[in-house]
Curated annotation (Swiss-Prot):
Protein keywords: Calcium, Cobalt, Glycosyltransferase, Iron, Magnesium, Manganese, Metal-binding, Transferase
GO molecular-function terms, A-Z: hexosyltransferase activity; magnesium ion binding; protein homodimerization activity
Role description: Involved in the biosynthesis of 6-O-methylglucose lipopolysaccarides (MGLPs). Catalyzes the transfer of the glucose moiety from UDP-alpha-D-glucose (UDP-Glc) to the position 2 of 3-phospho-D-glycerate (3-PGA) to form glucosyl-3-phosphoglycerate (GPG).
Subunit structure, as described in the record: Homodimer.
Recorded catalytic activity of this chain's protein: an NDP-alpha-D-glucose + (2R)-3-phosphoglycerate = (2R)-2-O-(alpha-D-glucopyranosyl)-3-phospho-glycerate + a ribonucleoside 5'-diphosphate + H(+); (2R)-3-phosphoglycerate + UDP-alpha-D-glucose = (2R)-2-O-(alpha-D-glucopyranosyl)-3-phospho-glycerate + UDP + H(+)
Organism domain of life: Bacteria
Record's protein name: Glucosyl-3-phosphoglycerate synthase
Species for this entry: Mycobacterium tuberculosis (strain ATCC 25618 / H37Rv)
Cofactor mode of binding and number, as noted: Requires divalent cations for activity. Mg(2+) gives the maximal activity, but the enzyme can also use Ca(2+), Mn(2+), Fe(2+) or Co(2+) ions, but not Zn(2+) or Cu(2+) ions.
Binding residues annotated for UDP-alpha-D-glucose, in chain numbering: 50-54, 81, 114, 134-135, 229-232, 256-261
Family: Belongs to the glycosyltransferase 2 family.
Enzyme class: transferase
Residues that coordinate or bind (2R)-3-phosphoglycerate: 184-187, 260
Primary gene name: gpgS
């Protein structure tokens, strides 16, 4: 069925595509740790923290998860993407196992980007369920991981659990008592509008680019991984195309604060998200990187040209590299 046919069917049914929330949406998760541990039923859980120069936040992220290790969580690793600061030292001091990209899959030459790190983490972990948590979070809630694995442990047919949350633009807004927003600019200005145009059924996914999510190993190892910041949108669309909306859940994590990036970096991120989304929808991408002109000089009379590369090359499903 084409996207146009799906849209027509939704309109005939009296609702706009993506207008209704997923049936598998948890707004206020109520599972206890004990209930989730019992629901594991022999399954194992790995938590992966992809990191690149996150010395300022890596310790607090690990500290929010480490009390769960040897209980709900069976494995916690930091997948380091070539940090040049003290990320590795601080992660080890906090009790995490640190694995480099090269160590995770030594027989395969390394490529840059987040998608590469997440893909390689599948070779460095063994859990039946894999949870990804970004390492730049500021004071993350200690129940992020339990909330994300809850639908996988207690639901039927769920393979991917995305997070959603309020995203303040300024870190100071988190404790101000004001219901501030403004974060997630790439999500709101690029990803969700494009999904509305090309995959309207996914309009009910509040945070398609969220870096906090969980999935079954069976699913993750069967999918290609898009490069760089295209990895999240690629996994979401691939899961939907393969298994449908019923396989995707989302959980409210409350508030998420992290280091917000400048607009030039967000432009590069957006370019990769667009390239991946177009490719997943069968639309050819030019493969041309994003050229920006950055003002400088005392009177902004000088502009520096900078081109960010974009990649159209996925990594193959890990099952191809490491059959089990």
């Amino acid at each position: 069925m084409t996207a146009s046919e799906l849209v027509a069917g939704d309109l005939a049914g009296g609702r706009a595509p993506g207008a209704l929330p997923l049936d598998t949406t948890w707004h206020r998760p109520g599972w206890t740790i004990g209930e989730l541990e019992a629901a594991k039923a022999g399954r194992t859980i790995s938590v992966v923290l992809p990191a690149l120069n996150e010395e300022a936040t890596i310790e607090s992220v690990i500290d929010s998860i480490s009390p769960l290790v040897d209980g709900l969580v069976d494995e916690l690793i930091v997948l380091d993407s070539g940090s040049t600061d003290d990320t590795e030292i601080r992660a080890i001091a906090s009790g995490a196992r640190v694995v480099s990209r090269e160590q995770a899959l030594p027989e395969v030459p390394v490529r840059p980007g987040k998608g590469e790190a997440l893909w390689r983490s599948l070779a460095a972990t063994s859990g039946d369920i894999v949870v990804f948590i970004d390492s730049d979070l500021i004071n993350p809630h200690p129940l992020f991981v339990p909330w994300l694995v809850g639908p996988l442990l207690t639901g039927e047919g769920i393979q991917l659990v995305k997070s959603f949350y309020r995203r303040p633009l300024q870190v100071s807004d988190v404790t101000s008592g004001v219901c501030a927003t403004g974060g997630g600019r790439v999500t709101e200005l690029v990803a969700r509008p494009l999904l509305a145009a090309l995959r309207p059924e996914l309009g009910c996914v509040l945070q398609p680019l969220s870096g906090e999510y969980a999935a079954s190993r069976e699913l993750l190892t069967s999918l290609p991984f898009a490069p760089g910041y295209g990895v999240e949108i690629g996994l979401l669309i691939d899961t939907f195309d393969r298994l449908g909306l019923d396989a995707i859940a989302q959980v409210n994590l409350g508030v998420r604060a992290h280091r917000n990036r400048p607009l030039d970096e967000l432009g590069a991120m957006s370019r990769q998200v667009i390239a991946t989304l177009l490719s997943r929808c069968g639309i050819p991408d030019s493969g041309v990187g994003l050229t920006q002109f950055l003002p400088g000089g005392p009177d902004d009379s000088d502009y520096t040209r900078h081109t960010w590369p974009v990649s159209l090359v996925d990594r193959p499903p890990m099952k191809v590299m490491r059959p089990r």
